[in-house]
Design a protein with these regions (language model features):
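Short beta-strand/loop segments at the ligand-binding rim of alpha/beta enzyme cores
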Residues: 61-65, 140-145, 205-215, 281-290
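Glycine-rich beta-to-alpha transition loops that act as phosphate-gripper elements at the mouths
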Residues: 71, 147-150, 214-220, 269, ...
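N-terminal capping/small domains of soluble enzymes
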Residues: 2-15, 20, 49-144, 149-151, ...
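Glycine/Thr-rich beta-alpha phosphate-binding loop at enzyme active sites
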Residues: 114, 178-193, 224-285
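Catalytic cores of alpha/beta
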Residues: 76-77, 158-163, 219-231, 281-282, ...
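Alpha/beta catalytic cores of nucleotide-metabolism and tRNA/nucleoside-modifying enzymes
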Residues: 2-18, 48, 263-283, 294-352
Length: 352
């Protein structure tokens, strides 16, 4: 395994590596529904208006969002760089009670990706609210995305309702697609009726926007996405990991203890891109594109396919600076392809 890999994001960073030179102003802002996220518009540069991206009234400094499970609770990365450069981030998936997760080894690097079966390890919603979010607040001034998981409708609604009361939380991301836990979560994401049921239940107990995170391990993700929209979802996050495994040829056993796990990384980017493209044609709510993104070019492709913002997952585990670097590279990459406004390219690949 590469020396850059981190299991569970228990990372000790060198503060001397922190650098904060990023594009200023409104150059890379994005709107997601009704949630405004970003600096005051007075900070805009002369080219800021030309580079803004809007979708409803939600606003981000840029479309780059570290994905849940690959960025810890954010403060770990704050020792590396100023995480306020991010659009926002989705913190580690949270359940009602603490979970120790699956046996180890539960994460392994393989060509073009990573296989993991963490098992939703987390301290539980009360500990996240009382301990993790206050610590994050000292280094991150923006609202974040709370990723919630559950093993029953009651658990989903309980966790979501508690995060709904948190000022630091701007969006609640409902994970109905986690492939790592036996007899939980995944069942809600495999049928239209089950996905709609959890969506409607969570929507009934919160006022904050909810984004439903969908699994690609289904026969018709477009129908499930549409069912979530009809049930009241404010947006969608897709895709979660594909199912996969690798076998150690020396031991002749699977490389992770749980045998199978979620496969993520650059190899799944074409699958994720196609899924975003297909779902965009079927729904009117915003999409956060996820899956194999590792460059500014990938971000632009995702947005052309229909994503309003882009989450970056496995790449964070391989290169912890990747989100910061992509944000830095976006202006020059946009110029390279003759893109003047990010808002103009959302869904642009559907026009041909």
């Amino acid at each position: 395994m590469s020396g850059k890999m981190q299991d569970e994001m228990n990372i000790s960073f060198n503060k001397s590596l922190v650098t904060n030179e990023l594009p200023s102003g409104d150059a890379l802002k994005v709107r997601l529904g009704n949630w405004e996220q970003g600096r005051d518009s007075s900070a805009a540069t002369s080219s800021g208006d030309a580079l803004k991206v809007r979708l409803g009234n939600w606003l981000l400094d840029n479309p780059v969002i570290p994905a849940s499970g690959t960025f810890g609770y954010g403060y770990e990365f704050a020792e590396l760089y100023d995480i306020n450069c991010l659009g926002t981030f989705s913190f580690k998936g949270t359940t009602l009670e603490p979970r120790f997760g699956n046996p180890t080894p539960r994460i392994a690097e393989c060509p073009a990706g990573i296989i993991n079966s963490i098992g939703l390890q987390n301290p539980g919603v009360d500990a996240v609210i009382n301990n993790e979010l206050p610590r994050l607040k000292r280094c991150f001034s923006k609202q974040v995305i709370a990723n919630v998981s559950g093993f029953s409708i009651h658990e989903y609604t309980e966790v979501a309702a508690r995060f709904n009361e948190c000022e630091q939380v701007g969006i609640i991301e409902v994970n109905i697609s986690c492939p790592n836990v036996h007899n939980g979560g995944m069942s809600f994401g495999t049928t239209c009726d089950a996905a709609a049921e959890v969506t409607k239940a969570v929507k009934s107990v919160v006022q904050k926007p909810i984004f439903i995170k969908l699994s690609p391990n289904v026969t018709d993700i477009v129908s499930i996405a549409k069912a979530c929209e009809d049930a009241g979802a404010d947006g969608l996050s897709l895709i979660n990991t594909l199912m996969g495994m690798r076998i150690d040829l020396h031991r002749r056993t699977p490389v992770i203890a749980n045998k199978k796990g979620g496969f993520s990384g650059s190899a799944i980017f074409p699958v994720a891109l196609k899924t975003v493209y297909d779902v965009y044609e079927a729904v009117k709510i915003p999409i956060m594109g996820i899956g194999g993104v590792s460059s500014a070019d990938d971000v632009l492709e995702m947005m052309l396919a229909g994503a309003a913002a882009v989450q970056i997952g496995a790449a964070n585990l391989i290169e912890p600076y990747i989100c910061r670097d992509i944000i830095r590279e976006l202006p020059s990459t946009m110029k390279k392809y003759g893109i003047n406004k990010l808002e103009d390219i959302i869904g642009g690949a559907h026009n041909g």
